[in-house]
A protein has these predicted regions:
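Sec-dependent signal peptide recognition
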Residues: 2-10
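N-terminal signal peptide c-region/cleavage motif recognized by signal peptidases
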Residues: 14-16
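Alpha-helical, hydrophobic structural elements that either
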Residues: 18-268
Length: 268
């Protein structure tokens, strides 16, 4: 059962005007079981609004959630990303010119509610958006040709505790180098990087041409653990020789906060 909510954005910065963000509750997956695996409650949120067009990262902060039996619901631990920012994901069906092209989705995961619970009575918190246009320091640009193969030197990355190395196109990384990963050779239509980000400060990484236009991709693969990983991005076409990487880093000035207050979310 789907319920609809609309909330309004109060800008976190004085120079940022308020913007409307529509939040729709999508699919709800409720797996109440006594087992340790595949259990839990997953709530899909769909977001749309003008502020999202410039956003490069998103995360949710849940202050409290209570079901209709009065029990507090505990947010499930994200073993892969922790509480850091994530890249925005298009809603299924979006990106191909249909009505969902400007709609994004995210998921909230909670531990099992009681079997008697029929709804989430209240869910309070916030959605935080990384909007790089609010702070030039939030965007770091590097040349693949000039900077690949060595740790990127940058004050913002250093302050965030991030180590970042662009992979050399077509070159195979030495096993054990940098962050303990063995990297296989990149294909002629692939670009990649190696990152250690213990605080979850890097929201996303894009590869672009020299003019800043994002290179279209078919997806990515990654390996790693403990906030360190090796990533390969498969591009639709062979990347240009002057390709650049744009690294989007969370800074205090770049974050816009959307208050979140949802009520009476029916459970399946």
């Amino acid at each position: 059962m789907k319920t609809f909510f609309q909330i309004f954005m109060a800008a976190a910065l004085a120079q940022a005007a308020s913007a409307e963000v529509k939040v729709t509750v999508g699919d709800i997956s409720d797996k109440r079981t006594t087992g340790k695996f595949f259990a839990g409650l997953e709530i899909e949120l769909k977001l749309s609004g003008p502020e999202l067009a410039d956003a490069k990262g998103i995360r949710t902060v849940v202050k409290d959630a209570t079901d209709d039996t009065g029990k507090a619901l505990k947010k499930a631990e994200n073993r892969f990303r922790g509480d850091g920012f994530e890249e925005l994901q298009k809603s299924f069906g979006g990106g191909f010119g249909d009505k969902k092209a400007d709609e994004f989705q995210m998921k909230l995961e909670f531990e099992n509610p009681p079997r008697a619970a029929k709804a989430i009575k209240a869910l309070n918190g916030s959605v935080e958006l990384l909007v790089p246009s609010k702070d030039p320091a939030a965007v770091i640009t590097a040349s693949v040709a000039k900077d690949a193969g060595k740790p990127l030197e940058n004050a913002t990355l250093k302050a965030a505790g991030v180590q970042f190395t662009l992979r050399k196109p077509g070159k195979e990384e030495k096993k054990g180098a940098d962050f303990g990963f063995g990297g296989g050779a990149l294909g002629e239509s692939e670009l990649g990087y190696v990152i250690s980000d213990p605080k979850g400060k890097v929201a996303s990484v894009e590869f672009c041409d020299a003019t800043g236009k994002k290179l279209e991709s078919n997806g990515s693969t990654s390996s790693g653990f403990n906030n360190s990983k090796t990533v390969a991005i498969s591009l639709r076409d062979k990347p240009p020789a002057d390709a650049i990487a744009k690294i989007y880093v969370v800074t205090e000035k770049s974050v816009v906060t959307v208050p979140l207050a949802l009520k009476d979310i029916a459970l399946p």
